[in-house]
Amino acid sequence: MKYIYLLILFVIGCSSTDNLENNFGIVIHGGAGTILKENMTLELEEKYKNALKEAVVIGYEILNDGGTSQKAVEKTINYLEDSPLFNAGKGAVLNFDGEVELDASFMEGKNLNAGAISGSKKIKNPISTAIKVMNSSSHVMLSGKGADDFAVEHNMETVEQNYFKTERRINSLEKIKNIENNKVSNLSNSDYRVQKLGTVGCVALDKFGNLSAGTSTGGMTNKKWNRIGDAPIIGAGTYANNKSCAVSSTGWGEYFIRGVVAYDIAALMEYKNLSIRKAAKTVIEKISKMGGDGGVI
């Protein structure tokens, strides 16, 4: 595959007494796509690796100190949202109108509680607001102005659009518009497809045996009509159940929605007793046959 996958950093910890009840683990991804391997300089690649390492350390330390998987997932993703390198929060891709629209979702496996937001134009850390929706409302998913209003009412940090925008994303929008307008003839299909991918995510297991999963994204470059991908959709982009697994997806959202990717993996584990590796492989192969691509943790 031509794309570079900013996957995966995995850490698992055990107590010195090897008590399985004290095991914990965390896995993160920085998205599939958004940058082609041949366009990645060594310097930029090192920046990505360092940012991912720093992010996973945040979650690891929380879990190691006995913190919850919810907190570990939230704070790890917060770090990635605050970095201009990733397609989430600051540095997210731009839509057709040159604006950022942000999506995020969170789910905890112990009780199947979940929260999500989509189409936000000013929430600094969408994953935190998704968790706030879960904990402080009777709803699961809020969108657009409603999500932004909810964030303000609950004292979540909001910022102006210029905070999110970077020169790299502005240039990417111009490039993809040229492709779609047939003004540039020397760009490959992969140049076009790579603009459709990109997300950050984290799954974690805490010492209490509880799983959590979270996903945050700016979606696809040049998206129109308030398009929403899989990232904020529970069961497609994010899923967690203590009976099976925790999943965060990254890839071509339309296919991941149609394939109900995150839940499908958990269902294969719970109802067909497949291993997590076999279940994930089966579902990703299904998506590939449909014409999509991407990955999961």
Residue positions per predicted region:
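Sec-dependent signal peptide recognition
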Residues: M1-L7
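Alpha/propeptide regions of enzymes that mature by internal proteolysis
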Residues: D18-I297
